[in-house]
A protein has these predicted regions:
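Extended, well-ordered alpha-helical scaffold segments
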Residues: 46-65, 110-126
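Amphipathic alpha-helix from the class-I
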Residues: 39-46, 103-107
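Early exported N-terminus immediately downstream of N-terminal targeting peptides
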Residues: 35-40, 62
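CBM-like carbohydrate-recognition segments
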Residues: 75, 87-176
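Glycine- and aromatic-rich loop/turn segments at beta-sheet edges
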Residues: 1-20, 64-84, 127-147
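Long, repeat-rich segments with strong aromatic
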Residues: 43-44, 51-70, 82-94
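A short glycine-threonine-serine/GTX helix/turn-capping micro-motif
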Residues: 19-27, 148-152
Length: 176
């Protein structure tokens, strides 16, 4: 709770990374933040029981996640100790960028603060698209932070790129 991040599961509550830090996995936290956006899509605006809780969680987590974005626009697989695996990673980056853009579009997150984060994330994701149209720098199926190589690709990174694109389109269409 203090970190405004989520452990992958109970096995990681006391786990430590190579530097003795807490283990907060990028893609796992991407599932949470992206999941919050998806939940909010289906909660009615007038819901006073659950909607405020999920909106606040999206706000708090987005603030923390934004602070962890690297200069190149990507997040690393180990969110709090990015230098352990310093290479870019697209599955977490895509989910974070999507959820933050959703939050902007819904008025949950302020555009002036978060659009620069989205721009950097979008640019990073686009740079990861190779000549075959695949999104590289994707951590393979895993359960914790780990090494990533440029050629690694999975459909879930393409999916998050398309989700970001749909939210960017919505934003641009509404702000002509």
């Amino acid at each position: 709770k203090d970190e405004h991040l989520f452990f992958r599961d109970g096995k990681y509550l006391n786990a430590k990374d190579e530097k003795g830090g807490k283990v907060f996995w990028s893609r796992g936290n991407g599932w949470v933040l992206g999941g919050l956006a998806e939940v909010l899509k289906y909660l009615p605006e007038e819901d006073k029981k659950y909607r405020p809780f999920y909106e606040q969680l999206l706000q708090e987590m987005s603030e923390k996640i934004a602070s962890l974005q690297r200069e190149d626009g990507y997040w690393r697989t180990n969110l709090l100790n990015a230098d352990i695996y310093p290479m870019p990673e697209t599955s977490g980056t895509g989910l974070f960028t999507y959820a933050i853009m959703y939050g902007i579009n819904q008025g949950i997150l302020p555009a002036d603060k978060y659009l620069p984060i989205v721009r950097k994330g979008w640019d990073a994701m686009v740079k990861a698209v190779n000549t075959e149209g695949k999104v590289g720098w994707t951590q393979m199926v895993a359960q914790k932070p780990g090494k990533v190589v440029k050629k690694d690709t999975r459909a879930y990174s393409v999916g998050s790129l398309l989700m970001i694109a749909s939210e960017l389109y919505r934003y641009l269409d509404n702000n002509k």
